[in-house]
């Protein structure tokens, strides 16, 4: 499944290079117009990242996101620095279908497990942003990649599987924003190890060949941001390559 994505800083559409706020590209686009275009081309899910909120919990762009959700028919998945149950509940209340939880799942595992019990596994997507070390271990980073988390991808998945984990977004940080292609070996490995989880691939997508490679890896979906913004290909072309599930 194709999941077009936009990242927002203070209401503007941006892209970061490898999660670095200092390496930011701003696009002169209306977020709603851009997402409406993706929707019109056939996207059933859209992914929005609140980068302002990820950096400063007191500056969350919830009002903007509420306006986007109300103006769109597609299902919306939102991430970016979710730290409290109130923030999670607020996003679900404004019509967000699924909330992406990253750093907190590493730092406050029991708290996030309780949210799975309360809100259900379909309302939450774990974001596992990994640095792969020389030993091949997939170490999950936290806090907008500004620090290593020290937990392996597998240990976190195993901690949440008893709570019904269904959706997980995995980014190889070394590929993010680089347009160097996805780490398909990573997705092939985790899809084989945990076939009952819907894996979303993210990071490095540049071409339709990259989309096809992820499709064939066993991942269930692919998040595409930069390649669409710089018009390497269109959402319509991506969906022709990897049709939405019926």
Curated annotation (Swiss-Prot):
Supply the enzyme class, top level.
isomerase
Q: What is its main location?
A: cytoplasm
Assigned keywords, A-Z: Amino-acid biosynthesis, Cytoplasm, Histidine biosynthesis, Isomerase
Locations listed in the record: Cytoplasm
The record's annotation in InterPro entries points to: Aldolase_TIM, His_biosynth, HisA_bact_arch, Isoase_HisA-like, Isoase_HisA-like_bact, RibuloseP-bd_barrel
The catalytic activity of this protein is classed by the Enzyme Commission as: 5.3.1.16
The record's catalysed reaction(s) read: 1-(5-phospho-beta-D-ribosyl)-5-[(5-phospho-beta-D-ribosylamino)methylideneamino]imidazole-4-carboxamide = 5-[(5-phospho-1-deoxy-D-ribulos-1-ylimino)methylamino]-1-(5-phospho-beta-D-ribosyl)imidazole-4-carboxamide
Name recorded for this polypeptide: 1-(5-phosphoribosyl)-5-[(5-phosphoribosylamino)methylideneamino] imidazole-4-carboxamide isomerase
State the superkingdom: Bacteria
Q: Name one GO biological process term.
A: L-histidine biosynthetic process
MF terms from GO for this chain are: 1-(5-phosphoribosyl)-5-[(5-phosphoribosylamino)methylideneamino]imidazole-4-carboxamide isomerase activity
Which NCBIfam families is this protein grouped with?
1-(5-phosphoribosyl)-5-[(5-phosphoribosylamino)methylideneamino]imidazole-4-carboxamide isomerase
Q: Which family does it belong to?
A: Belongs to the HisA/HisF family.
Q: What is one cellular component GO term in this UniProt entry?
A: cytoplasm
- Provide the active-site residues from the annotation: 7 (proton acceptor), 129 (proton donor)
Q: Give TM segment ranges.
A: none
Q: Supply the HAMAP family for this chain.
A: HisA
Give the pathway listed in the UniProt entry for this protein: Amino-acid biosynthesis; L-histidine biosynthesis; L-histidine from 5-phospho-alpha-D-ribose 1-diphosphate: step 4/9
């Amino acid at each position: 499944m194709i999941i077009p994505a936009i990242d927002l800083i203070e209401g503007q559409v941006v892209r970061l290079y490898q999660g670095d706020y200092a390496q930011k590209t701003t696009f002169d686009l209306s977020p709603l117009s851009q997402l409406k275009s993706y929707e019109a081309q056939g996207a059933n899910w859209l992914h929005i990242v609140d980068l302002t909120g990820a950096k400063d919990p007191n500056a969350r762009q919830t009002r903007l996101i509420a306006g986007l959700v109300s103006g769109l028919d597609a299902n919306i998945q939102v991430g970016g620095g979710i730290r409290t149950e109130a923030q999670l509940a607020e996003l679900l209340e404004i019509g967000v279908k699924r909330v992406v939880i990253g750093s907190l799942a590493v730092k406050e595992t029991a708290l996030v497990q309780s949210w799975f019990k309360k809100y259900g596994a379909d309302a939450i997507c774990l974001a596992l942003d990994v640095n792969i070390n020389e030993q091949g271990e997939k170490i999950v980073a936290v806090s907008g990649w500004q620090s290593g988390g020290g937990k392996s991808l597998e240990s976190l998945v195993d901690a949440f599987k008893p709570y019904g984990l269904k959706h997980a977004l995995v980014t190889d940080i070394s590929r993010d924003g680089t347009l160097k292609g996805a780490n398909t070996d990573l997705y092939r490995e985790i899809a084989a190890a945990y076939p009952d989880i819907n894996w979303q691939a993210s990071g490095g997508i540049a071409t339709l060949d990259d989309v096809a490679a992820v499709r064939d890896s066993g991942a269930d979906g692919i998040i595409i941001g930069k390649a669409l913004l710089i018009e390497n290909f269109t959402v319509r072309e991506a969906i022709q390559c990897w049709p939405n599930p019926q």
